[in-house]
Amino acid sequence: MTKQRVDVRNRDRIQDLCDRVLDGASIDKEEALWLFELEEQADITDLMAAANRIRQHFKGNRIHLCSIVNAKAGGCSENCKFCSQSSAYQTQSPKYGFVDAEPLRQASEEAKENQVTAVGLVAAWKGLREGPILDEVCDRIREMAAEGKVRPDASLGLIDSQEVANRLKDAGLECYGHNLESSRRFFPEHCTTHSFDDRLKTIGFLQKAGIKICSGGIIGMGESREDRCDLALELRAIGASVVPVNFLNPIDGTPYENMEALPPMEILKTVACFRFLLPDKEIMVAGGRTINLRDLQSMIFMAGASALMVGNYLTTLNQSVDQDLQMLRDLGLSPDWKPELAEEGSCADSSCGCGVTPKNEEASLPIGSF
Protein backbone atom coordinates (compact mmCIF):
# COMPACT_ATOMS: atom_id res chain seq x y z
CA MET A 1 0.00 0.00 0.00
CA THR A 2 2.82 2.42 0.81
CA LYS A 3 4.44 1.81 -2.57
CA GLN A 4 1.13 2.49 -4.32
CA ARG A 5 0.69 5.80 -2.46
CA VAL A 6 4.22 6.87 -3.46
CA ASP A 7 3.45 6.04 -7.10
CA VAL A 8 0.31 8.16 -6.96
CA ARG A 9 2.23 11.07 -5.48
CA ASN A 10 4.83 10.77 -8.21
CA ARG A 11 2.15 10.68 -10.88
CA ASP A 12 0.50 13.74 -9.41
CA ARG A 13 3.78 15.64 -9.26
CA ILE A 14 4.65 14.72 -12.85
CA GLN A 15 1.22 15.95 -13.92
CA ASP A 16 1.64 19.18 -11.98
CA LEU A 17 5.00 19.89 -13.62
CA CYS A 18 3.54 19.05 -17.02
CA ASP A 19 0.62 21.44 -16.52
CA ARG A 20 3.00 24.21 -15.52
CA VAL A 21 5.09 23.69 -18.65
CA LEU A 22 1.96 23.68 -20.81
CA ASP A 23 0.99 26.99 -19.19
CA GLY A 24 4.31 28.50 -20.28
CA ALA A 25 6.29 28.23 -17.04
CA SER A 26 9.81 26.80 -16.71
CA ILE A 27 10.81 24.13 -14.23
CA ASP A 28 13.95 24.65 -12.14
CA LYS A 29 16.94 22.38 -11.60
CA GLU A 30 15.61 20.76 -8.44
CA GLU A 31 12.36 19.82 -10.17
CA ALA A 32 14.14 18.66 -13.31
CA LEU A 33 16.64 16.55 -11.38
CA TRP A 34 13.76 14.84 -9.60
CA LEU A 35 12.46 13.79 -13.02
CA PHE A 36 15.88 12.53 -14.13
CA GLU A 37 16.14 10.44 -10.95
CA LEU A 38 12.84 8.58 -11.44
CA GLU A 39 13.50 4.84 -11.63
CA GLU A 40 10.23 2.91 -11.34
CA GLN A 41 8.89 1.84 -14.72
CA ALA A 42 5.41 3.14 -13.88
CA ASP A 43 6.88 6.56 -13.12
CA ILE A 44 8.91 6.60 -16.32
CA THR A 45 5.88 5.73 -18.44
CA ASP A 46 3.90 8.49 -16.71
CA LEU A 47 6.77 10.88 -17.44
CA MET A 48 6.84 9.85 -21.10
CA ALA A 49 3.08 10.33 -21.44
CA ALA A 50 3.40 13.83 -20.02
CA ALA A 51 6.35 14.64 -22.31
CA ASN A 52 4.29 13.45 -25.26
CA ARG A 53 1.53 15.91 -24.29
CA ILE A 54 4.11 18.70 -24.19
CA ARG A 55 5.43 17.70 -27.62
CA GLN A 56 1.98 17.67 -29.13
CA HIS A 57 1.12 21.02 -27.56
CA PHE A 58 4.22 22.84 -28.82
CA LYS A 59 5.18 20.87 -31.96
CA GLY A 60 2.08 19.04 -33.15
CA ASN A 61 2.44 15.74 -34.99
CA ARG A 62 4.88 16.85 -37.66
CA ILE A 63 8.41 15.49 -37.29
CA HIS A 64 11.45 17.35 -38.58
CA LEU A 65 13.87 15.20 -40.57
CA CYS A 66 17.47 16.03 -41.41
CA SER A 67 20.58 14.28 -42.63
CA ILE A 68 24.32 14.88 -42.67
CA VAL A 69 27.26 14.49 -45.03
CA ASN A 70 30.73 13.64 -43.77
CA ALA A 71 32.36 16.38 -45.85
CA LYS A 72 35.88 15.83 -44.47
CA ALA A 73 36.66 12.57 -42.69
CA GLY A 74 39.23 11.42 -40.16
CA GLY A 75 42.49 12.87 -38.91
CA CYS A 76 40.94 15.29 -36.44
CA SER A 77 43.41 16.88 -34.01
CA GLU A 78 40.98 16.81 -31.08
CA ASN A 79 40.94 13.94 -28.58
CA CYS A 80 37.19 13.52 -27.95
CA LYS A 81 37.02 10.03 -26.44
CA PHE A 82 33.76 9.10 -28.16
CA CYS A 83 34.96 9.92 -31.69
CA SER A 84 36.47 7.43 -34.14
CA GLN A 85 37.72 10.30 -36.33
CA SER A 86 40.25 11.54 -33.78
CA SER A 87 43.89 11.12 -34.82
CA ALA A 88 44.62 10.21 -31.19
CA TYR A 89 43.06 6.74 -31.61
CA GLN A 90 43.58 3.75 -33.88
CA THR A 91 40.22 3.08 -35.55
CA GLN A 92 38.88 1.95 -38.91
CA SER A 93 37.35 5.35 -39.66
CA PRO A 94 37.84 6.53 -43.27
CA LYS A 95 40.07 9.51 -44.04
CA TYR A 96 39.66 11.98 -46.91
CA GLY A 97 39.86 15.70 -47.57
CA PHE A 98 37.05 18.20 -48.02
CA VAL A 99 34.65 16.98 -50.70
CA ASP A 100 33.84 18.78 -53.94
CA ALA A 101 30.38 19.83 -55.05
CA GLU A 102 29.15 16.55 -56.57
CA PRO A 103 28.70 14.44 -53.37
CA LEU A 104 26.83 17.34 -51.79
CA ARG A 105 24.60 17.69 -54.84
CA GLN A 106 23.76 13.99 -54.65
CA ALA A 107 23.06 14.22 -50.92
CA SER A 108 20.74 17.17 -51.49
CA GLU A 109 18.83 15.32 -54.20
CA GLU A 110 18.41 12.22 -52.02
CA ALA A 111 17.31 14.35 -49.09
CA LYS A 112 14.64 16.10 -51.14
CA GLU A 113 13.33 12.75 -52.43
CA ASN A 114 13.07 11.53 -48.82
CA GLN A 115 11.26 14.65 -47.52
CA VAL A 116 14.31 15.77 -45.56
CA THR A 117 14.46 19.51 -44.91
CA ALA A 118 18.16 20.11 -44.21
CA VAL A 119 21.51 18.57 -45.08
CA GLY A 120 24.40 19.36 -42.78
CA LEU A 121 28.03 19.54 -43.86
CA VAL A 122 30.20 18.01 -41.14
CA ALA A 123 34.00 18.16 -41.07
CA ALA A 124 36.47 16.30 -38.86
CA TRP A 125 38.88 19.05 -37.90
CA LYS A 126 39.35 21.41 -34.97
CA GLY A 127 37.60 24.30 -36.60
CA LEU A 128 37.49 27.11 -39.14
CA ARG A 129 39.65 30.18 -39.58
CA GLU A 130 40.30 32.60 -42.42
CA GLY A 131 41.99 30.93 -45.38
CA PRO A 132 41.45 28.70 -48.44
CA ILE A 133 39.43 26.08 -46.55
CA LEU A 134 36.93 28.70 -45.38
CA ASP A 135 36.68 29.95 -48.98
CA GLU A 136 35.88 26.41 -50.14
CA VAL A 137 33.33 25.86 -47.37
CA CYS A 138 31.53 29.08 -48.29
CA ASP A 139 31.49 28.03 -51.96
CA ARG A 140 29.84 24.71 -51.07
CA ILE A 141 27.21 26.46 -48.93
CA ARG A 142 26.41 28.93 -51.71
CA GLU A 143 26.12 26.13 -54.27
CA MET A 144 23.74 24.09 -52.12
CA ALA A 145 21.62 27.14 -51.33
CA ALA A 146 21.44 28.11 -55.01
CA GLU A 147 20.18 24.65 -56.00
CA GLY A 148 17.26 25.13 -53.62
CA LYS A 149 16.62 21.43 -52.98
CA VAL A 150 17.29 21.52 -49.22
CA ARG A 151 18.60 24.00 -46.69
CA PRO A 152 22.39 23.72 -46.24
CA ASP A 153 23.49 23.57 -42.62
CA ALA A 154 26.96 22.96 -41.22
CA SER A 155 28.95 21.64 -38.29
CA LEU A 156 32.54 22.66 -38.84
CA GLY A 157 34.04 22.82 -35.38
CA LEU A 158 35.34 25.78 -33.43
CA ILE A 159 35.33 29.29 -34.90
CA ASP A 160 38.13 31.63 -33.91
CA SER A 161 36.70 35.02 -34.88
CA GLN A 162 33.55 36.99 -35.53
CA GLU A 163 34.69 37.52 -39.12
CA VAL A 164 34.52 33.79 -39.84
CA ALA A 165 30.97 33.57 -38.51
CA ASN A 166 29.98 36.60 -40.57
CA ARG A 167 31.36 35.00 -43.74
CA LEU A 168 29.33 31.84 -43.14
CA LYS A 169 26.22 33.95 -42.72
CA ASP A 170 26.97 35.91 -45.89
CA ALA A 171 27.38 32.63 -47.79
CA GLY A 172 23.82 31.71 -46.87
CA LEU A 173 24.23 29.55 -43.78
CA GLU A 174 21.21 29.75 -41.49
CA CYS A 175 22.05 27.12 -38.87
CA TYR A 176 25.23 25.74 -37.34
CA GLY A 177 25.59 22.55 -35.34
CA HIS A 178 27.91 22.80 -32.36
CA ASN A 179 27.19 20.37 -29.55
CA LEU A 180 28.16 21.14 -25.98
CA GLU A 181 28.39 17.32 -25.69
CA SER A 182 28.03 17.18 -21.89
CA SER A 183 27.80 19.30 -18.76
CA ARG A 184 30.57 21.75 -17.96
CA ARG A 185 31.67 19.55 -15.04
CA PHE A 186 31.95 16.38 -17.13
CA PHE A 187 33.44 17.93 -20.29
CA PRO A 188 37.14 17.43 -19.31
CA GLU A 189 36.41 13.72 -18.81
CA HIS A 190 35.92 13.25 -22.56
CA CYS A 191 37.95 16.06 -24.15
CA THR A 192 41.09 17.96 -23.10
CA THR A 193 42.27 19.54 -26.37
CA HIS A 194 39.67 22.29 -26.11
CA SER A 195 37.31 23.49 -23.41
CA PHE A 196 33.63 23.89 -22.70
CA ASP A 197 34.17 27.65 -22.84
CA ASP A 198 35.74 27.33 -26.31
CA ARG A 199 32.47 25.86 -27.49
CA LEU A 200 30.42 28.59 -25.83
CA LYS A 201 32.65 31.21 -27.47
CA THR A 202 32.00 29.70 -30.89
CA ILE A 203 28.26 29.73 -30.26
CA GLY A 204 28.50 33.38 -29.26
CA PHE A 205 30.19 34.33 -32.56
CA LEU A 206 27.53 32.47 -34.53
CA GLN A 207 24.61 34.00 -32.67
CA LYS A 208 26.05 37.50 -33.10
CA ALA A 209 26.21 36.81 -36.85
CA GLY A 210 22.52 35.89 -36.83
CA ILE A 211 23.02 32.15 -37.31
CA LYS A 212 20.68 29.80 -35.46
CA ILE A 213 22.22 27.22 -33.15
CA CYS A 214 21.75 23.46 -33.07
CA SER A 215 23.40 22.13 -29.93
CA GLY A 216 22.97 19.04 -27.82
CA GLY A 217 25.10 16.26 -26.47
CA ILE A 218 25.93 12.60 -26.08
CA ILE A 219 24.32 10.48 -23.39
CA GLY A 220 25.98 7.37 -22.00
CA MET A 221 29.64 8.42 -21.64
CA GLY A 222 29.70 7.74 -17.91
CA GLU A 223 28.13 11.02 -16.88
CA SER A 224 25.69 11.29 -13.97
CA ARG A 225 22.01 12.10 -14.24
CA GLU A 226 22.80 15.49 -12.78
CA ASP A 227 25.27 16.03 -15.64
CA ARG A 228 22.46 15.34 -18.12
CA CYS A 229 20.23 17.76 -16.27
CA ASP A 230 22.94 20.43 -16.26
CA LEU A 231 23.50 19.95 -20.00
CA ALA A 232 19.81 20.51 -20.72
CA LEU A 233 19.79 23.62 -18.52
CA GLU A 234 22.87 24.99 -20.31
CA LEU A 235 21.21 24.41 -23.67
CA ARG A 236 18.17 26.27 -22.43
CA ALA A 237 20.39 29.14 -21.31
CA ILE A 238 22.15 29.53 -24.67
CA GLY A 239 18.86 29.41 -26.57
CA ALA A 240 19.60 26.46 -28.86
CA SER A 241 16.89 26.17 -31.52
CA VAL A 242 17.38 22.43 -31.95
CA VAL A 243 18.73 19.98 -29.40
CA PRO A 244 20.14 16.72 -30.79
CA VAL A 245 20.28 13.96 -28.21
CA ASN A 246 22.85 11.34 -29.20
CA PHE A 247 23.52 8.05 -27.43
CA LEU A 248 27.02 6.65 -27.24
CA ASN A 249 27.83 4.02 -29.82
CA PRO A 250 31.13 2.59 -28.54
CA ILE A 251 33.63 2.36 -31.40
CA ASP A 252 36.56 -0.07 -31.36
CA GLY A 253 39.83 1.74 -30.82
CA THR A 254 38.38 4.66 -28.87
CA PRO A 255 38.71 4.99 -25.07
CA TYR A 256 34.97 4.31 -24.77
CA GLU A 257 35.02 1.07 -26.78
CA ASN A 258 33.99 -0.98 -23.73
CA MET A 259 31.52 1.48 -22.23
CA GLU A 260 28.38 -0.28 -21.04
CA ALA A 261 25.23 0.80 -22.86
CA LEU A 262 22.43 2.55 -21.01
CA PRO A 263 19.12 0.68 -20.63
CA PRO A 264 16.61 1.78 -23.29
CA MET A 265 14.16 3.03 -20.65
CA GLU A 266 16.88 5.28 -19.19
CA ILE A 267 17.39 6.72 -22.67
CA LEU A 268 13.67 7.32 -23.18
CA LYS A 269 13.44 8.92 -19.75
CA THR A 270 16.27 11.28 -20.68
CA VAL A 271 14.47 12.35 -23.87
CA ALA A 272 11.33 13.02 -21.84
CA CYS A 273 13.24 15.13 -19.31
CA PHE A 274 14.77 17.20 -22.10
CA ARG A 275 11.25 17.87 -23.41
CA PHE A 276 10.19 19.17 -19.99
CA LEU A 277 13.17 21.53 -19.86
CA LEU A 278 13.05 22.58 -23.52
CA PRO A 279 9.34 22.39 -24.30
CA ASP A 280 9.21 24.45 -27.50
CA LYS A 281 12.50 23.32 -29.05
CA GLU A 282 13.15 20.61 -31.60
CA ILE A 283 14.32 17.64 -29.54
CA MET A 284 16.12 15.52 -32.11
CA VAL A 285 17.07 11.90 -31.53
CA ALA A 286 20.21 11.28 -33.54
CA GLY A 287 23.33 9.13 -33.29
CA GLY A 288 23.20 5.78 -31.54
CA ARG A 289 19.44 5.29 -31.56
CA THR A 290 19.46 2.10 -33.63
CA ILE A 291 22.04 0.21 -31.58
CA ASN A 292 20.84 1.48 -28.19
CA LEU A 293 17.05 1.45 -28.55
CA ARG A 294 16.63 -1.47 -30.94
CA ASP A 295 12.91 -2.42 -31.01
CA LEU A 296 11.99 0.61 -28.89
CA GLN A 297 13.04 3.23 -31.46
CA SER A 298 9.48 4.29 -32.21
CA MET A 299 8.92 5.18 -28.55
CA ILE A 300 11.18 8.24 -28.84
CA PHE A 301 8.24 10.27 -30.13
CA MET A 302 6.00 9.13 -27.29
CA ALA A 303 8.82 10.31 -25.01
CA GLY A 304 8.74 13.80 -26.51
CA ALA A 305 11.12 13.80 -29.49
CA SER A 306 10.03 16.00 -32.39
CA ALA A 307 12.89 15.53 -34.84
CA LEU A 308 14.92 12.68 -36.26
CA MET A 309 18.28 12.22 -37.90
CA VAL A 310 17.77 10.00 -40.95
CA GLY A 311 20.26 8.29 -43.22
CA ASN A 312 23.66 7.11 -42.05
CA TYR A 313 25.72 8.93 -39.45
CA LEU A 314 29.32 10.10 -39.80
CA THR A 315 31.02 6.71 -39.39
CA THR A 316 28.20 4.36 -38.35
CA LEU A 317 25.07 3.00 -40.02
CA ASN A 318 21.45 3.86 -39.36
CA GLN A 319 18.31 2.02 -40.43
CA SER A 320 17.01 2.97 -43.88
CA VAL A 321 15.08 6.17 -44.52
CA ASP A 322 12.18 4.07 -45.82
CA GLN A 323 12.01 2.31 -42.45
CA ASP A 324 12.01 5.64 -40.63
CA LEU A 325 9.24 7.04 -42.84
CA GLN A 326 7.19 3.89 -42.27
CA MET A 327 7.75 4.27 -38.52
CA LEU A 328 6.28 7.77 -38.69
CA ARG A 329 3.28 6.60 -40.69
CA ASP A 330 2.62 3.78 -38.24
CA LEU A 331 2.49 6.34 -35.41
CA GLY A 332 0.22 8.75 -37.27
CA LEU A 333 3.08 11.25 -37.64
CA SER A 334 4.36 12.95 -40.78
CA PRO A 335 7.52 14.75 -41.92
CA ASP A 336 7.41 18.53 -41.76
CA TRP A 337 8.89 18.87 -45.24
CA LYS A 338 6.80 20.56 -47.92
CA PRO A 339 7.73 20.69 -51.63
CA GLU A 340 7.25 24.43 -51.81
CA LEU A 341 9.77 25.11 -49.04
CA ALA A 342 12.80 24.40 -51.19
CA GLU A 343 11.30 26.33 -54.09
CA GLU A 344 10.00 29.40 -52.30
CA GLY A 345 12.10 29.51 -49.15
CA SER A 346 9.16 30.51 -46.97
CA CYS A 347 6.32 28.91 -45.08
CA ALA A 348 2.82 30.23 -44.57
CA ASP A 349 2.16 28.08 -41.52
CA SER A 350 4.09 29.25 -38.47
CA SER A 351 2.94 26.24 -36.46
CA CYS A 352 4.12 23.52 -38.83
CA GLY A 353 7.55 23.25 -37.26
CA CYS A 354 9.39 23.27 -40.57
CA GLY A 355 11.79 25.88 -39.33
CA VAL A 356 11.50 28.20 -42.34
CA THR A 357 10.76 31.76 -41.31
CA PRO A 358 7.24 32.92 -42.23
CA LYS A 359 6.89 36.50 -43.41
CA ASN A 360 7.12 38.95 -40.52
CA GLU A 361 7.79 36.13 -38.06
CA GLU A 362 10.86 34.59 -36.48
CA ALA A 363 11.11 30.82 -36.27
CA SER A 364 13.52 28.31 -34.81
CA LEU A 365 15.40 26.65 -37.62
CA PRO A 366 16.09 22.94 -37.21
CA ILE A 367 19.42 21.51 -38.28
CA GLY A 368 21.10 18.15 -38.30
CA SER A 369 22.85 16.58 -35.35
CA PHE A 370 26.59 16.62 -35.31
Question: Predicted segments — roles?
Answer:
Residues G24, A51, C80, H178, ...:
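Conserved, mostly hydrophobic/aromatic
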Residues D46-Y89, Y96-G120:
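N-terminal pre-triad scaffold of radical SAM enzymes
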Residues M1-E40, R236-F370:
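Auxiliary Fe-S-binding modules of radical SAM enzymes
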Residues A88-T202, K212-I219, S241-N246:
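Core AdoMet radical
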Residues D160-L168, G222-E234, I291-M302:
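Catalytic cores of alpha/beta
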Residues A107, E136-R140, M144, V164, ...:
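A general structural detector for well-ordered alpha-helical segments in enzyme core domains, enriched
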Residues K212, G216-G217, E226-C229, R236:
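Conserved mixed alpha/beta catalytic, RNA-binding, or beta-rich assembly cores of soluble enzyme
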